[in-house]
């Protein structure tokens, strides 16, 4: 008996993993000296700061934010900017906002700083927050000093540059990178607006000294907030594949022309490597000596898989969907 396409898809999904093996995995800590120093410098600069803008990745709105920020940066007015909204599936945006409100986060703006989407909301929101708060030790200064904080590689520098484009018609003032750790020290003030006169302090990305769970660590790593090799590129690619299949997102199938979804990372990476012509020579010892064998370059395929995800080529993804639905990978 032949199965209908729908029945066939259901049968394939039934064979997919229901959970990702997290036991025994030790997500490496990425808390080098410049992170600890950066947090101390932020604290020492607080006296001059009117408001805190915390930037985080919109794909993980409920995961990976550094709890030390709340503890060390005190009662300053706070705006959470969820950046890279173009990469996130925001069908449940209202649920995200409600979840954050329960955590005490009352002011949230979703942005895409690369294309300046929603960035115009930031300065009016900050101005209102500062205007309704007591400006400790600031006297009658008319300018605003805003500190931009967040974990690595979420778009803090991109936000500053976007604000300058929007309000000053000027270009980059701070370097932007696709890897964590580009901004190494608390920088001098950068003007982003004339009216009101507003300066921003760009700061280095600071992760929590301890990532609370392996699942959170993997999500952070997928978003590029820790260096891939600390977790393992093929491990990250496998977690990404598991997540996409579990959410029934088949963008990777179309992007790589795979024909059908698959839950085996070795098989997927092999097909990706063949399609991209990513191969490597490997010496194999035989009875007649060493023989060079051409094999798929699995690490190169994994890197391309991750790059495609981070570039939005696999479609928008909400990595915290389980948390929004009250589940985690360990429970599912």
UniProtKB/Swiss-Prot annotation:
Keyword Membrane appears in the UniProt entry: yes
GO-annotated biological processes: mitochondrial translation; regulation of mitochondrial translation; regulation of respiratory system process
Matching Pfam families: MMR_HSR1
Taxonomy, superkingdom: Eukaryota
GO cellular component: mitochondrial inner membrane; mitochondrial matrix; mitochondrial ribosome; mitochondrion
Domain CP-type G per the UniProt entry, residue ranges: 36-209
ATP-binding as UniProt keyword: no
Gene3D superfamilies per the UniProt record, alphabetical: 1.10.1580.10, P-loop containing nucleotide triphosphate hydrolases
Record: residues binding GTP: 83-86, 153-158, 205
MF GO annotations: GTP binding; GTPase activity
Major place of residence: mitochondrion
Subcellular location(s) per record: Mitochondrion inner membrane
This protein's UniProt keywords: GTP-binding, Membrane, Mitochondrion, Mitochondrion inner membrane, Nucleotide-binding, Transit peptide, Translation regulation
Membrane topology label: Peripheral membrane protein
Function: Plays a role in the regulation of the mitochondrial ribosome assembly and of translational activity. Displays mitochondrial GTPase activity.
Subunit (UniProt): Associates with the mitochondrial ribosome large subunit; the association occurs in a GTP-dependent manner.
Family: Belongs to the TRAFAC class YlqF/YawG GTPase family. MTG1 subfamily.
Protein name (database record): Mitochondrial ribosome-associated GTPase 1
Biological source species: Bos taurus (Bovine)
Classification of source organism: Eukaryota, Metazoa, Chordata, Craniata, Vertebrata
């Amino acid at each position: 008996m032949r199965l209908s396409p729908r029945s066939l898809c259901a049968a394939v999904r039934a064979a997919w993993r229901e959970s990702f093996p997290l036991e025994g995995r030790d997500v490496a800590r990425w808390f080098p000296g410049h992170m600890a120093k950066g947090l101390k410098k932020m604290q020492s600069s607080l006296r001059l700061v009117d408001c805190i803008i915390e930037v985080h990745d919109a794909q993980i709105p409920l995961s990976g934010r550094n709890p030390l920020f709340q503890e060390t940066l005190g009662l300053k007015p706070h705006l959470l900017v969820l950046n890279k909204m173009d990469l996130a599936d925001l069908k449940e945006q209202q649920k995200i906002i409600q979840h954050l409100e329960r955590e005490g986060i009352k002011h949230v703006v979703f942005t895409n700083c690369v294309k300046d989407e929603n960035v115009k909301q930031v300065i009016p929101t900050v101005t209102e927050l500062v205007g309704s708060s007591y400006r400790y030790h600031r006297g009658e200064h008319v300018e605003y000093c805003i500190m931009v904080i967040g974990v690595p590689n979420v778009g803090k520098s991109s936000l500053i540059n976007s604000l300058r484009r929007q309000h000053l018609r000027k270009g980059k003032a701070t370097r932007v990178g696709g890897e964590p750790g580009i901004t190494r020290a608390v920088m001098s003030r950068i003007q982003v607006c004339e009216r009101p006169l507003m300066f921003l302090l760009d700061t280095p990305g600071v992760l929590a000294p301890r990532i609370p769970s392996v699942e959170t660590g993997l999500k952070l790593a997928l978003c590029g907030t820790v260096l891939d090799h600390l977790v393992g590129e093929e491990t990250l690619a496998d977690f990404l594949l598991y997540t996409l299949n579990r959410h029934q997102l088949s963008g990777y199938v179309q992007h790589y022309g795979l024909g059908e979804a698959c839950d085996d990372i070795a098989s997927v990476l092999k097909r990706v490597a063949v399609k991209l012509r990513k191969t490597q020579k490997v010496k194999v010892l035989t009875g007649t000596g060493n023989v060079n064998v051409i094999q798929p370059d699995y690490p190169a395929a994994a890197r391309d898989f991750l790059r495609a995800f981070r570039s939005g080529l696999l479609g928008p993804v909400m990595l915290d969907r389980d948390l929004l639905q009250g589940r985690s990978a360990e429970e599912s």
